[in-house]
Amino acid sequence: MLNSVKKLLGDSQKRKLKKYEQLVQEINNLEEKLSDLSDEELRHKTITFKDMLRDGKTVDDIKVEAFAVVREAAKRVLGLRHYDVQLIGGLVLLEGNIAEMPTGEGKTLVSSLPTYVRALEGKGVHVITVNDYLAKRDKELIGQVHEFLGLKVGLNIPQIDPSEKKLAYEADITYGIGTEFGFDYLRDNMAASKNEQVQRPYHFAIIDEIDSVLIDEAKTPLIIAGKKSSSSDLHYLCAKVIKSFQDTLHYTYDAESKSASFTEDGITKIEDLFDIDNLYDLEHQTLYHYMIQALRAHVAFQCDVDYIVHDEKILLVDIFTGRVMDGRSLSDGLHQALEAKEGLEITEENQTQASITIQNFFRMYPALSGMTGTAKTEEKEFNRVYNMEVIPIPTNRPIIREDKKDVVYVTADAKYKAVREDVLKHNKQGRPILIGTMSILQSETVARYLDEANITYQLLNAKSAEQEADLIATAGQKGQITIATNMAGRGTDILLGEGVHELGGLHVIGTERHESRRVDNQLKGRAGRQGDPGSSQFFLSLEDEMLKRFAQEEIEKLTKSLKTDETGLILTAKVHDFVNRTQLICEGSHFSMREYNLKLDDVINDQRNVIYKLRNNLLQEDTNMIEIIIPMIDHAVEAISKQYLVEGMLPEEWDFASLTASLNEILSVENMPSLSANNVHSPEDLQSVLKETLSLYKERVNELDSNTDLQQSLRYVALHFLDQNWVNHLDAMTHLKEGIGLRQYQQEDPTRLYQKEALDIFLYTYGNFEKEMCRYVARHLGVPENVQ
């Protein structure tokens, strides 16, 4: 098996695999010796390893013996012994790379090895799973091994309170879902005191199903939002107006990027209906925003694909998993636009208070690794964004699943009829069948075709998510037919029922190519686990969503030269090349979009780091607030100077009255010097005129240094002003990001344009925060009457 895997690897990875084999041999050589130790002697190894690390040894120095200790502990506690290939997987993870292991190869047991070794450093290890159920399961299972060896294991899930979270993070190893770790990071950076924070500095994380977390959810921001009111009447009115709009006449929609915009005719129609002269005028900004969100809600979001309506509420659906995203809502009025589209009650609009993408959250970990059954197709992205290699791990038993060649039909109707025939054929043999679909809508379409032939099945999609684990658990029973969204039940094994092995195992049917080969491979991988028999077959049509979105023109050309049989099956061989090529184009498009979004997100990520660093400094009780305020005075004076002493204007044209009033707001001085074109000809002149005044004022501020009550008051006020300005900044950045793609003037790069304008917005935000702090101090000192 190792030799067959080596053939698929590059020279670098072949060398690594050879190195891993040598290390595995060293681990195996220790097995007999460790098996002779008592439980107490084995447990004491943890103390020995910690002492070695404290004395200057490294993780590399202890890993061989540490892995052997974990293997021995697992044998005693769980009755499970790590296979050699699982040891290889553990070594890959320890080095901060991705172990590609087919489902059913025991990834959970593999994770026990590197988590133990890195936990010995005493800085905490996070194990990321895709849902709460798996986090609890893995913590309870593998946690027994680590606790046997003297380590503390914690669980971080949304349902626990902050005090429990703090304990979970103080544990040596903490299990949980990635989004909750991210939300805790955001909450910690909104805390009013250090005592409210629960996390400690990041150290090492292992992500299960890493492709799902870092690729599929890469663009998904984690958002903590407050509520702000929105106009229900205007949302309903805009939804009604949009329903009368015609594609290409009033708006354009790009299915590939899912972006929509109004045409000139569309703009004119809006202006006529609302009786306004210019939709782009500042006074009509709210109307334009509501209209563009109404347009997006109608053309870019499809019911039972992107969302479902349940109990008079819009519930968003994860397009990759088919699961409802509990607690998630769209921001910036888009969720309300969907509610108006469906005629539901309009909820309050969300205003972002803190946000970070999954990508940038996990990039904060100094060391990161992961496991999945399918990552090789995304290796380039993992390497470029996270500096991680994807290393295929040999299977313990050979994979004998038969992956049949795709069949392609002209129409969707012909495809679904062929799916039905395939279901009847394999069901007659008694084999269990799993039918993978792209969306809720498609799963219900397949169900209708099976209903027509009175075929009994179980349907698993976002509308039946509560039964997911039970439905997947029975999907391998004799004669069972299950229709499911492609990723449903991921992390739960489909075990073959009695007698199914002899019939040929589970048969998987794909009803459409996904926009990534990786997800297709995941569906195939539901069959043939751990050396079981199984098969897979994809049924496609030229009306499939991916082909229509990315190759509509090519389809029209292709259909002229195709040969088909009486069922609509395409016999022309080149159709397979066409499908494969289109899927690669689609993957490239998504990669480019993620890369582009990451470039934009890196800008706000840098800004976030500046704000959060300052915020954490403010939370420190020993931070001297006066030392923070003094530089702000100079910055505020400089900002006011730039605002009123406009470059390119004559001094006689400068507004000295407003300049003086603004300075009086931030400086509590008895005798503000007279400012005019007579004594101020440049910003440098202003600094010179104010030099003595500023010096005396700073002395007064410095006298407040010993006032401990004021220090505490300044701390709370600074946190309030900083948080409020950051919320407004995030709002401004959202609008900037939405509009930047439409503003590619001449040859200007939208990324550079975004970076430039984002910097301007950030400088304004930070400057406004500093001015507000200076005003507060001035009010505390009391502005003398003669300068009012």
From Swiss-Prot:
Q: Tell me where it resides.
A: Cell membrane; Cytoplasm
Where is this protein chiefly located?
A: membrane
Q: Name the residues that span the membrane.
A: none
Q: What is its EC number?
A: 7.4.2.8
One MF term in GO for this entry?
Answer: ATP binding
**What Pfam families does UniProt report for this protein, alphabetically?**
P-loop_SecA, SecA_DEAD, SecA_PP_bind, SecA_SW
- Note the CDD domains from the entry: DEXDc_SecA (cd17928), SF2_C_secA (cd18803)
Cytoplasm listed as a keyword? yes
What keywords were assigned to this record?
Answer: ATP-binding, Cell membrane, Cytoplasm, Membrane, Nucleotide-binding, Protein transport, Translocase, Translocation, Transport
A GO BP entry is:
intracellular protein transmembrane transport
Q: Could you tell me the membrane topology recorded for this protein?
A: Peripheral membrane protein
| First-level EC class | translocase
InterPro entries on file: Helicase_ATP-bd (IPR014001), Helicase_C-like (IPR001650), P-loop_NTPase (IPR027417), SecA (IPR000185), SecA2_Bac_anthr (IPR030908), SecA_CS (IPR020937), SecA_DEAD (IPR011115), SecA_motor_DEAD (IPR014018)
GO cellular component entries: cell envelope Sec protein transport complex; cytosol; plasma membrane
Instruction: Summarize where ATP binds, as residue positions.
Output: Q86, G104, E105, G106, K107, T108, D493
Catalysed conversion reaction: ATP + H2O + cellular proteinSide 1 = ADP + phosphate + cellular proteinSide 2
Does the keyword field hold Protease? no
Here the disulfide bonds are none
What is the similarity comment for this entry?
A: Belongs to the SecA family.
Instruction: Fetch the NCBIfam families from UniProt.
Output: PRK09200.1, secA, SecA2_Bac_anthr
| Function noted in UniProt | Part of the Sec protein translocase complex. Interacts with the SecYEG preprotein conducting channel. Has a central role in coupling the hydrolysis of ATP to the transfer of proteins into and across the cell membrane, serving as an ATP-driven molecular motor driving the stepwise translocation of polypeptide chains across the membrane.
Q: Quaternary state and partners of this protein?
A: Monomer and homodimer. Part of the essential Sec protein translocation apparatus which comprises SecA, SecYEG and auxiliary proteins SecDF. Other proteins may also be involved.
> Per its record, how is this protein called by name?
Protein translocase subunit SecA 2
- What taxonomic lineage is listed for the species of origin? Bacteria, Bacillati, Bacillota, Bacilli, Bacillales
Recorded name of the encoding gene: secA2
